[in-house]
UniProtKB/Swiss-Prot annotation:
Gene Ontology terms: cellular component: ribonucleoprotein complex; ribosome
GO molecular function: rRNA binding; structural constituent of ribosome
Job of this protein: Binds to the 23S rRNA.
GO biological process, any: translation
Entry-linked PROSITE patterns: RIBOSOMAL_L9
Highest taxon, organism lineage: Bacteria
Entry's family note: Belongs to the bacterial ribosomal protein bL9 family.
The entry's keywords: Ribonucleoprotein, Ribosomal protein, RNA-binding, rRNA-binding
Family matches, as InterPro entries: Ribosomal_bL9, Ribosomal_bL9/RNase_H1_N, Ribosomal_bL9_bac/chp, Ribosomal_bL9_C, Ribosomal_bL9_C_sf, Ribosomal_bL9_N, Ribosomal_bL9_N_sf
Protein name listed in UniProt: Large ribosomal subunit protein bL9
Gene from which this protein is expressed: rplI
Length: 150
């Protein structure tokens, strides 16, 4: 199925690219999320008329993500208190939601989907460097310190 991308999609293309994808991927993911439209003659003309508006919107989103990344860099670290045993092993774990809530409480709005934990949840006290993917082009890092609750 031929489609026109309305946003940058990893491993597929950028704004305005006409690409061929499987019809299920287009119908079930790209179309419902507003990331693409079918590449009909009518849609191509409509897209070309709106291209400047869409490019401005994407540039605005990138600028907002860069501003948030600077705020995260100023924050540098965030501390989370969690119940733990004598040897530093947590009762439970610290996941993406806990980290996102702690960063948001510190003053920078972060969604849990933007927190990347490639090794899974954190289960011990200590310091961890966590990546935040604020935009497809903007990835920043923050130090998360997990301490035992008193």
């Amino acid at each position: 199925m031929n489609i026109i991308l309305l946003d940058k999609i990893a491993n597929l293309g950028g704004l305005g690219d006409q690409v061929t994808v499987k019809s299920g991927y287009a119908r079930n993911f790209l179309f419902p999320q507003g990331k693409a439209v079918p590449a009909t003659k009518d849609n191509v003309e409509k897209f070309e008329a709106r291209r400047a508006e869409l490019e401005a919107k994407i540039a605005e989103q990138l600028a907002a993500a860069n501003a948030r990344a600077e705020k995260v860099a100023e924050l540098a670290e965030v501390t989370i208190a969690a119940p733990a045993g004598d040897e530093g092993k947590l009762f439970g774990s610290v996941g993406t939601r806990d980290i996102a809530d702690a960063i948001t409480a510190a003053g920078v709005e972060v969604q849990k989907a933007e927190v990347k934990l490639p090794t899974g949840t954190l289960r011990e006290t200590g310091e961890y460097d966590i990546d935040l993917q604020l935009h497809s082009d903007v990835i920043t890092s923050i130090k998360v310190i997990i301490i035992a609750e008193a």
